[in-house]
Amino acid sequence: MQLTLWTYEGPPHVGAMRIAASMKGVHCVLHAPQGDTYADLLFTMIERRPGRPPVSYSTFNARHLGRDTAELVRETVTAAYERYQPEALLVGDSCTAELLQDQPGDLAQGMDLPVPVIGLELSAYSRKEGYGASEAFYQLVRGLLETNGASAGAQPDASRAPRANLLGPTSLGFRCRDDVQEVTRLLESVGVEVNVVAPLGASPEDLRRIPEADFNVCLYPEVARSTCEWLQRRFGQPTVTTVPLGLGATRDFLAEVGRVTGLDVSQGVADANARMAWYSRSVDSNYLTGKRVFIFGDGTHAVAAARIASEELGFEVVGLGTYAREEAREVRRAAKAYGVEPLITDDYLEVERAATEASPELVLGTQMERHIAKRLGVPCAVISAPVHVQDFPARYAPNMGLEGANVIFDTWVHPLMMGLEEHLLGMFKEDFEFTADAPSHLEAGAAPSPGGAAREEGQAETAVAVAESEEGAEVRWTPEAEAELKKIPFFVRGKARRNTERFAADRGIATITVETIYDAKAHFSR
């Protein structure tokens, strides 16, 4: 067990909650103690849902352990069915309740309720949230279709348009709502109808219609891969596995749809030329070429982000990793292609160390990487769950398809542009026009702070700055050297300071001057 301030994934039962919360007519019953009943906070505060998630808890405590806790499960399942009248029930236990070995899924299935009851065994002490969502969705789809007696998929019919299922979007996912809308529009542009979107917004009756489609689109492999593989074995439905994140992947996605359906999608591929393509070639974006980028997130978004960064924006990928061990193989393959060491970990401190060592100029990651980048003073864009409330925007902001490519360009490039602006302000902040005591350009400017001049005078009297080198030796910076260091762009200033201090310590230099900075630069440039 590890004590931590942050976790990229919750326990598996959180994944099961996400599936239930994504759907209509599905209720999740969890055998759980009082401390595991925090679903309301996740879904109402972070995702800004207008209603409570459809989850009920047995909520056992110490006094219940002296009697039959299995009876408490039956009472909770009965109460949940009578109150909510769901079309299907998911029943499992939380990580704490798993220790009791009450088997709540089996208990609920033995109650002969008039609705399908899907028991979940989620292996809480060896798996995490992503697996819980994948397993809950798979068991729900399989349970409903086998109960329904479905035996064959859709037969080819030239009189109608091909039909597709979009599988994988969930509550608490990254931009799922808008991605579904954009991919639906993209498919319709080449003559493909969307049959079912699941689990997001689907009902159990919708899941029973999945076999009516001609093929499945695995939009979010972390959730839908195992379900798509089973549907292909059971009903012969092919799966489109390309995720349309970025212009290149969108073209590949349309080409794969064309191969699966036999449609001529050449015009759609030719038209897949979003504004991002021009912007990334335009004069005002030339300075972006070669920017060092560190990427960390779920497997799907991390690998896609690396491709976009390298092939479409001309960035240099200096770090690539994921917290999802189920996606480690794909991330390792991509990392090898970009010549970097893959980072497979769910320890945010290890991610911070790797990001610091990589000295990136842009960080792409989750909510935690946003905090890491802020501490490092590096621009950041969020590309993957887990995210906080600001990444569930009220506006339309997909990441997939053509409009998604435009959104990605804006989201990634604007922090760099604003970073350049901050750097210029930093360079010229000593200019007489930018001092705190300078008169405002506004007609009724605020009066200058009376303490401003005193502060400036006090700063000027500071003779030297003291720093700790990596080897622990104390080195001093002259005021001229500190001023010269501030002229270096903020996103590499930390690296320049560390290199200079290391250079000085190695050579026994006690006081760093401007000449020392340039000597260190020449040394490390070789």
UniProtKB/Swiss-Prot annotation:
Query: Active site annotated at which positions?
Result: 284 (proton donor)
What's the superkingdom here?
Bacteria
According to UniProt, the reaction catalysed is: chlorophyllide a + oxidized 2[4Fe-4S]-[ferredoxin] + 2 ADP + 2 phosphate = protochlorophyllide a + reduced 2[4Fe-4S]-[ferredoxin] + 2 ATP + 2 H2O
In the record, biological process GO terms are:
light-independent bacteriochlorophyll biosynthetic process; photosynthesis, dark reaction
Annotated cofactor note = Binds 1 [4Fe-4S] cluster per heterodimer. The cluster is bound at the heterodimer interface by residues from both subunits.
Q: Which InterPro entries match?
A: ChlB/BchB/BchZ, LI-POR_suB-like_C, Nase/OxRdtase_comp1, P-CP_red_C, Protochl_reductB, Protochlorophyllide_Rdtase
Pfam assignment, any one = PCP_red
**Keyword terms of this UniProt record:** 4Fe-4S, ATP-binding, Bacteriochlorophyll biosynthesis, Chlorophyll biosynthesis, Iron, Iron-sulfur, Metal-binding, Nucleotide-binding, Oxidoreductase, Photosynthesis
Q: Name one GO molecular function term.
A: ATP binding
Which cofactors are named for this entry?
A: [4Fe-4S] cluster
**EC number(s) recorded for this UniProt protein:** 1.3.7.7
Quote the PANTHER family the UniProt record gives. LIGHT-INDEPENDENT PROTOCHLOROPHYLLIDE REDUCTASE SUBUNIT B
Query: How does this polypeptide assemble, per the annotation?
Result: Protochlorophyllide reductase is composed of three subunits; BchL, BchN and BchB. Forms a heterotetramer of two BchB and two BchN subunits.
Its function, per the record, reads: Component of the dark-operative protochlorophyllide reductase (DPOR) that uses Mg-ATP and reduced ferredoxin to reduce ring D of protochlorophyllide (Pchlide) to form chlorophyllide a (Chlide). This reaction is light-independent. The NB-protein (BchN-BchB) is the catalytic component of the complex.
Family named by the database record: Belongs to the ChlB/BchB/BchZ family.
Please give the HAMAP family that the UniProt record associates with this protein: ChlB_BchB
Annotated protein name in UniProt: Light-independent protochlorophyllide reductase subunit B
